[in-house]
Swiss-Prot record:
Alphabetical list of Pfam families matching this protein: Anticodon_3, tRNA-synt_1g
Gene behind this protein: metG
Cofactor note: Binds 1 zinc ion per subunit.
Top-level enzyme category: ligase
Chain ranges passing through the membrane: none
Motif 'HIGH' region: positions: 10-20
Keywords of this entry: Aminoacyl-tRNA synthetase, ATP-binding, Cytoplasm, Ligase, Metal-binding, Nucleotide-binding, Protein biosynthesis, Zinc
Residues the record lists as binding ATP: K336
Protein name (Swiss-Prot/TrEMBL): Methionine--tRNA ligase
Lineage: Archaea, Thermoproteota, Thermoprotei, Sulfolobales, Sulfolobaceae
Length: 573
C-alpha cells in the first residue's frame, strides 16, 4: 500500500506560529514518521509547500517597489530552513506554488473542468482609494450569520461559514479601511452545485473522516453548494488558462489545493520516474492523509474532491482529513500585531525543539480548542518526559549495567509471574493501540496511550523491585524482570520516535540497536532484544526545565524577539 501524507500549505506572508505548526505541518510529520516505520519508507510520501500567490504579496511588493517573487523567494527559503533544519520536518518534497511543475499542472488540470466552468459577470469589490480590485480576504465586515464584526470576505473565523464580500454587512477595505464600491467584472466560476449530492454521499459514506470534519462539511453541503469563482483580477498568480481570461489569475485556493498533486509529480520528476506519481493518485491501493486546521475543512472536504470528480479522471479522493480545532495562547488567540503567542523561529531559542514537538502534540486540539500555557509546558517536560519516560529508561539500563555489565540476561518463559505476563501483554498490544489512533489522525490520543504504557512499566518496575531481587539472590526473577524491562525500553523508543526522533535515536544508541529509522513499527510489540546482547553507554535522556523557567520566560521571549525580527526576510518582518 502507498501512503500519501500532506499538510496544508503555509502562506508565506508571515512566519507560522505554534498554532499553525501543530494544525498542519508538525502533525503531518509525526504521522509520516510513524507511517514509514509501519509501511516502509519506500511506500510513504510526505509533501507540502509554500503558498505564495495572491493580493497580500502583490500589495507588499507594490509598497516596496519590487517584484513579488523577490519577496517570496526569501520567505520560502526562510520557512523551508525552519521546517527542515530546525523543526526536523521530514518532507520528501517541500515545494512552492511558483514551481514551474505546479504552474503547468494547474493550468492543464483546470482545462479539464471546462464542462463545469461558467462565465458570468460578477460584482467585485474595488477600492477607489487604493485603485485595486479586492480579493475576498481583503474585505472585512460583519458576518451576516453570527454577527462577528471582523469577518473576512471569504470566511468568518468565528462561525466558520464561507462568505463572499457582497454578503458582509458594512464591508471595508482591509488595506485603507474605506468602504469599497462593487464593479462588474467577468469571471470564471466552478459550478459546485453540480456535485452537491455526490459530495454529500461521499462524506456520509466515509468511515474514516473524523466527526468534527463531517459535521462542518455536511453543514455546508446542506445549505446547497454554489458556484465559486476560479479567477481573480490579481496580477501576482498563475495566469488563468481559459479563453478570454488572459488578464485574470487563478484564485489561490483552487491552485494551492492542486499542489498536493503537483508536489508528487515534481518529486518523481526529480528522480527521473515521471510516471510513478500516478501510484499515489490513481491506484486502488492508496491511503491519503490530510492534516489541516478546522478553517480549511470546506476547501479540503468539498472543493478539492469536487475538482477531482470534475476532472473526469479516477483520482483517489481524500481518506483521512485530520482537522484540528484552535490552539490558544494563555487564553487568547495568536496575534502578530499584538505580539500574542510564540512563532516558530522564536520557539527554538526558548526550549529544545524536540521538547516543543512533544508538548505541542500533547496539547494538540483534536476535539476542542486547547489552551497553551507555560505552566502546562513545564509540567509536561518535567513530569512526563523526565520523571516518566527518562527516569524509567535510565533505571532499567543502569540496573542492566550494574547487575550484568550491560549484557541482556537469559529469559525463562516458564518462570513468569502474573506481573511479568501482564507487562509482556502490554508490550504486545501497545504498538497497535497507538498506531490505530494515529491512523485516525488522533495523535494526542495515541501519545496518551504511550504515556499510559510508560506509567504501567514504571509501576511494574517498582513492584518487582530488582534491587531487592538482587539482594535476595533471586536470579531467575531478576533476569526476567530486566529482560522484559530492556525490551519495554525498545518499545518506548519506537513509540516515541515520531514525536522526538533524535531522542528516540539516543535511546536506541543506549540500547546499541543501530539506526531507529530502519526499524519496523511492529517490532515494538516483540521481545526482540535477546540474551547476550550488549547495550551501549547509558546517559541522561532529558533535562528538567528550571523552577524559574515559567516566571522568566516572557522576559526572555521579549529579548530574543527583537533580534529574531532583524534576521527575518523583508516580507516576514
Amino acid at each position: 500500500m502507498k501512503v500519501l501524507v500532506t499538510s496544508a500549505w503555509p502562506y508565506v506572508n508571515s512566519v507560522p506560529h505554534l498554532g499553525n505548526l501543530i494544525g498542519s505541518i508538525l502533525s503531518a510529520d509525526v504521522f509520516a514518521r510513524y507511517a514509514r516505520l509501519k509501511y516502509g519508507k519506500e511506500n510513504v510520501l510526505f509533501v507540502s509547500g509554500s503558498d505564495e500567490h495572491g493580493t497580500p504579496i502583490e500589495i507588499e511588493a507594490i509598497k516596496r517597489k519590487v517584484n513579488p517573487k523577490e519577496l517570496t523567494d526569501q520567505a520560502h527559503e526562510y520557512d523551508k530552513h525552519l521546517f527542515l533544519n530546525v523543526w526536523k520536518i521530514s518532507f520528501d518534497n517541500y515545494t512552492r506554488t511558483e514551481s514551474e511543475t505546479h504552474k503547468k499542472f494547474v493550468r492543464e488540470f483546470l482545462l479539464k473542468l471546462t464542462k463545469y466552468v461558467k462565465v458570468s459577470e460578477d460584482e467585485i469589490p474595488f477600492c477607489e482609494y487604493d485603485k485595486l480590485y479586492l480579493p475576498d480576504r481583503f474585505v472585512k465586515g460583519t458576518c451576516p450569520y453570527c454577527g462577528f464584526e471582523d469577518a473576512r470576505g471569504d470566511q468568518c473565523d468565528n462561525c466558520g461559514k464561507l462568505l463572499t464580500p457582497s454578503l458582509l454587512v458594512n464591508p471595508k477595505c482591509s488595506i485603507c479601511g474605506k468602504a469599497p464600491i462593487f464593479k462588474k467584472s467577468k469571471h470564471w466560476f466552478f459550478d459546485l452545485s453540480e456535485f452537491n449530492e455526490k459530495i454529500r454521499s461521499w462524506i456520509s459514506s466515509s468511515n474514516e473522516m473524523p466527526d468534527n470534519v463531517k459535521s462542518v462539511a455536511l453543514g455546508w453541503v446542506s445549505e446547497g453548494l454554489k458556484p465559486r469563482s476560479i479567477t481573480r483580477d490579481n496580477k501576482w498568480g498563475i495566469p488563468a488558462p481559459f479563453i478570454g481570461a488572459e488578464d485574470k489569475s487563478i484564485y489561490v485556493w483552487f491552485e494551492a489545493l492542486l499542489g498536493y498533486i503537483s508536489a508528487v509529480i515534481e518529486y518523481f520528476e526529480k528522480k527521473g520516474e515521471v510516471e510513478k506519481w500516478k501510484e499515489y493518485w490513481f491506484s486502488n491501493d492508496i491511503k491519503s492523509y490530510y492534516f489541516i486546521g478546522k478553517d480549511n475543512i470546506p476547501f479540503h472536504v468539498v472543493i478539492l474532491p469536487a475538482m477531482l470528480m470534475a476532472s473526469g479522471e479516477e483520482y483517489h479522493l481524500p481518506d483521512v482529513i485530520a482537522a484540528t480545532e484552535y490552539l490558544l495562547y494563555e487564553g487568547q488567540k495568536f496575534s502578530k500585531s499584538r505580539k500574542i503567542g510564540v512563532w516558530i523561529d522564536e520557539a527554538p531559542e526558548l526550549m529544545d525543539v524536540e521538547y516543543w514537538r512533544f508538548v505541542l502534540i500533547r496539547l494538540r486540539p483534536e476535539e476542542k480548542d486547547t489552551n497553551f500555557t507555560w505552566r502546562e509546558t513545564v509540567r509536561i517536560v518535567n513530569t512526563e518526559l523526565n520523571d516518566d519516560i527518562g527516569n524509567y529508561v535510565n533505571r532499567i539500563l543502569s540496573m542492566l549495567n550494574r547487575y550484568y555489565n550491560g549484557i541482556v540476561p537469559e529469559f525463562r518463559s516458564d518462570a513468569l509471574d502474573d506481573n511479568d505476563k501482564k507487562t509482556i501483554s502490554l508490550i504486545n498490544e501497545i504498538p497497535k493501540i497507538v498506531g490505530d489512533l494515529f491512523e485516525k489522525g488522533k495523535l494526542k490520543a495515541g501519545t496518551e496511550e504511550m504515556l499510559r504504557f510508560v506509567r504501567e512499566c514504571n509501576a511494574y518496575l517498582n513492584l518487582k523491585a530488582p534491587w531487592d531481587l538482587y539482594k535476595a539472590g533471586k536470579e531467575v526473577e531478576l533476569n526476567n524482570t530486566l529482560y522484559i524491562g530492556v525490551n519495554s525500553v525498545k518499545t518506548i523508543a519506537i513509540l516515541l520516535y515520531p514525536l522526538m526522533p533524535s531522542h528516540a535515536q539516543e535511546i536506541y544508541d543506549m540500547l546499541n540497536m543501530g539506526n531507529i529509522e530502519n526499524e519496523k513499527w511492529d517490532i515494538a510489540s516483540k521481545l526482540s532484544i535477546n540474551y547476550g546482547h550488549k547495550i551501549g553507554k547509558v546517559k541522561v535522556l532529558f533535562k528538567k526545565l528550571e523552577p524559574e523557567f515559567e516566571s522568566k520566560i516572557k522576559d526572555k521571549l521579549e529579548k530574543i524577539r527583537k533580534d529574531i525580527e532583524k534576521m527575518r526576510p523583508t516580507l516576514l518582518k
